[in-house]
Amino acid sequence: MLRNPLFPKFKLWFVLSLSIALSWGMSGRAHEVAPTIADFTVDDGTLSMVMRLNAEAFLAGIDLDGLGDTDDTDEGAAYDALRQLDAEGLEARFLPFAADWLARVGVEADGPVTLEITGFDAGEMGDPRFARSSELVVGATLPDGAQEMVLSWPVGAGTLVL
């Protein structure tokens, strides 16, 4: 039986190539842009909204509208640096940012409504191959008798799923 001396080399090359391709695909998940997901409730005239978001992407100043990967932006390096923060470090940086950014989120219910931060959980870093999901909780008192509410999402904030 004849053996091809190139077959073991080809097999090694194939396995290495496959491993590299798979690791590139998995490591990219930390840079894939996901929508902000918000759940809101209104109870006795009080609005509460819980937003699950990528705090590091917002902090880095990335325009998330239509973006698929944070590596495709000039702010990608800043995003990578922010991803290295522990939960306390991210909270210390995000809360002052969020207080200013929240003014750009428009809520109207028989007139403008002012949102206030009522909680923030940076979330644990976990597996660095995946983006961290942080939770921002905001609230507001709605005017008596308000029947409709309109939410305006800021330009550059990416997709919002309610």
Language model features: what each stretch is:
Residues L2-F14:
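Bacterial N-terminal signal peptides that target proteins for export
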Residues G25-S27:
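N-terminal signal peptide c-region/cleavage motif recognized by signal peptidases
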